[in-house]
Each structure stands twice: as C-alpha cells, then as structure tokens.
A protein has these predicted regions:
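Short, composition-biased local secondary-structure segments
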Residues: 1-10, 76-99, 136-159
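Acidic-basic catalytic patches of nuclease active cores, encompassing PD-(D/E)XK
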Residues: 2-48
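Generic structural signal for hydrophobic residues
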Residues: 29-33, 119, 178
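Structural element of the ATP-grasp superfamily
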Residues: 33-37, 123, 182
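Active-site metal-binding core of divalent-cation-utilizing nuclease and nuclease-like domains
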Residues: 40, 44-65
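Residue-level detector of anion-binding/catalytic polar loops
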Residues: 43, 129, 188
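Catalytic cores of nucleic-acid endonucleases
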Residues: 67-69, 73-133
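Mature, structured domains enriched in cysteine- and short glycine motifs
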Residues: 132-193
Length: 193
C-alpha cells in the first residue's frame, strides 16, 4: 500500500499525463495563463472556469494596482486561424466592463495559433494586446497558499477549490510541481486532516 504522499504524487502524475477533453485542455491553458499572471504579481479571477458558458467572453480578469486586464485565451491547433469575430467578442466584453465598472481595462488576446490579417488589423485598431503563448502541460500546478488563519495548505489541480485559490508571492505563497517542496516548506494537502 502506498503512503498518503505517494498516493497524492501518483494522482498528480496521472493528472498531468491524462489526455484531457477539449474543454479540459482549455481550462489547463487558462490555468497556465493565470499562473503566468500571478507569478508576475497580478491578482487573477478565473472568470471562464468559474462561470462556464456565462463568462461573457472573459477567461481571466487580472488586477494589479490600478491596471485591469481582460484576457481571452484560445488554445487552438496551430493549423487554425483566429478571425476578427473573436477579437470583436473581446472588444464587446471590454465595452460592457467599462459601462458596468467605470474602469478602462486593457484587452489581452492570448493564443496558441495565428491571427488572420483582418484580426491583426482589428487588434491594432482596438488597442488589444496579442500574445502567442504555447501550451505547456508541465507548468507548475501545485498551489501553496497561506489562508486567513495562517494555515499553510497546498492544492492540486483536481482539488475542489483549486480555482478559487489565489497565489500572492509577497505573502510567501508559490506554485510548484514538487510535493516534496510543499512538505519541506511546511505546507500540507488541503484534503488531509
């Protein structure tokens, strides 16, 4: 019989090797982009994962001081092309956000594939940032979080509240792929009593 930590490590390894559905790969890509933002000091709400089909075309809402980024993330085959209708969806949700929140966010379109010439023109004219970021299924996925009571807990991508947990570097929180690192730094798995 495996120890609890070895069992968790096996579950985590199996998750990373798993062949995910289209929506599962999309969530993985959104989580990777979230990781990149949080690593750089942003507070991120995973709007797309939490809201599902009702996400208003907003995969991530990212906040840093007075800056707001509304991110649309598209993990598509490198053989596909992003057309202007997807850029317009992001532009529309930005306008809706401005109307509701009286703040002027930056639109960011992140994808694994190319934009059509017209989509490139729209991105430029609408002042939307475009980033090409390849899906990396080995990005650090374990979240080491310190809760309000000071408890050091780590969350795995299949844990119930994983997407509700924020990582703030300035509080000593971090992402990793190593359960040993979590334990060594005094964190315990959220599911363990």
């Amino acid at each position: 019989m495996l120890s609890p930590m070895k069992t968790l490590q096996k579950k985590f390894n199996d998750f990373k090797k798993k062949i995910h559905s289209k929506s599962g790969i999309g969530e993985l890509y959104e989580r990777q982009i979230r990781y990149i933002y949080e690593k750089n000091g942003w507070w991120v709400k995973p709007y797309g994962i939490l809201k599902g089909k009702s996400d208003l075309g907003r995969d991530l809402l990212c906040y840093k001081k007075k800056q707001v980024h509304i991110v649309q993330a598209k993990n598509w085959s490198k053989y596909k092309t992003i057309h202007e209708k997807h850029i317009m969806q992001l532009a529309g949700t930005i306008l809706h956000y401005i109307q509701k929140n009286k703040k002027n966010p930056q639109g960011v379109f992140i994808t694994t594939t190319k934009l059509s010439p017209t989509a490139k023109e729209f991105v430029k004219k609408l002042n939307i940032k475009h980033r090409y970021i390849k899906l990396d299924q080995n990005f650090p996925m374990i979240k080491c979080n310190i809760n309000r009571k000071g408890k050091k807990l780590f969350f795995l991508p299949f844990d119930k509240f994983y997407d509700h947990v924020h990582i703030e570097k300035n509080k000593g929180e971090f992402y990793t792929n190593s359960l040993k690192e979590c334990i060594k730094k005094g964190f315990r798995h959220v599911g363990k009593r």
